[in-house]
Amino acid sequence: MRTAFKLMLGVTAITIMMAGCKSMNKTQKGAAIGTAGGAAAGAVIGKAAGNTALGAIIGATVGGVTGAVIGRKMDKQAEEIKNEVPGVKVERVEEGIVVEFSSEILFGFDRSDLTADAKAKLSDLSKVLTKYPDTNIEIQGHTDNTGTDAYNMQLSERRANSVAAHLRTLNVASSRISIKGFGESAPEYTNETDEGRAQNRRVEFLITANEKMKEEARKEAGETGN
């Protein structure tokens, strides 16, 4: 009961903070969100917002001055991804980065093997990922609502696995990579139109600080031992 109450308070506090901080940049928001977030709170917020990437990144948030240091590092990395990988959506979210690839770029219809264009773009992305090795990378597969729930879940997992496997061939360490398939369960766009369904067929990369980056950021922020 006490844990649930603390989680509720954490979720409420973060939700209020996010609603009132629209004028803040991503680095400032990273500093404002405290460790009250946590993985559980992040998952709740992500589900409520219909945004699995948001929830996962909030779950990895450190907050405070350390969070601001991490945010600056992520600002730099996000800009490099935008420059190196044109045509994909790159968004700074709190202390992380979300890179969104349309499935039309990566795969043929109803397939999970990568296209030649996909391999070229993933090669470009890997150059930035290997330059900044102190991050974790969660690869999320998503589909539209065409087909059965079970089939879409399997397809999203196969696609996420294909992307992860190719990144490993490009010298992105396996220890940094995790994958999740969401099937049709987490649409970011409407499934009522062809355009919306096409946008929901996507693969997202969630880039967050690993423990080494967090520890270095704590030292830089003078918060070692906190």
Question: What would you call each of these model-derived segments?
Answer:
Residues 1-9:
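Bacterial N-terminal signal peptides that target proteins for export
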Residues 47, 68, 72, 84-88, ...:
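Structured segments of extracytoplasmic/periplasmic soluble domains
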